[in-house]
């Protein structure tokens, strides 16, 4: 299960980078399961999950010793896709900060990491509670 894999990767203390790959439908399912607030992406024809989108979840260590997390959707602008331009530091993709329903960000636009972990676990539990027929359809 994708949510479990992401949650397991985020829990690893020695992991510096993980790349998991999927389709826009996978991204949409993850965003729905995590209860991401509704949004409309700027500079995109597909305003929810454009082709080639990535969910980027960063784990940060604060000066207070607490772990924090950010969730962003990274995607190419429609003109970058249309013109087939290479994404570089001078021609970067768009970064859109995602918000989770009923969770508060701090002044740095970050969530407490434990709250994000709990959100993942809630979504995993909700999936596990589904009848088998619904799991097969998902």
Regions found by a protein language model. Give the residues of each.
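Non-catalytic terminal regions with compositionally biased, polar/charged low complexity
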Residues: 1-138
């Amino acid at each position: 299960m994708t949510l479990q894999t992401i949650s397991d990767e985020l829990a690893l203390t020695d992991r510096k980078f993980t790349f998991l790959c999927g389709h826009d439908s996978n991204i949409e399912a993850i965003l729905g399961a995590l209860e991401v607030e509704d949004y409309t992406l700027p500079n995109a024809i597909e305003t929810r999950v454009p082709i080639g989108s990535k969910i980027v979840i960063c784990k940060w260590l604060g000066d207070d010793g607490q772990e924090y997390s950010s969730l962003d959707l990274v995607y190419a602008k429609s003109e970058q896709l249309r013109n087939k331009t290479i994404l570089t530091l001078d021609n970067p993709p768009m970064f859109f900060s995602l918000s989770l329903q009923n969770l508060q960000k701090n002044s740095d636009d970050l969530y407490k990491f434990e709250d994000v972990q709990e959100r993942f676990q809630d979504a995993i539990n909700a999936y596990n509670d589904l009848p088998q027929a619904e799991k097969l359809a998902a």
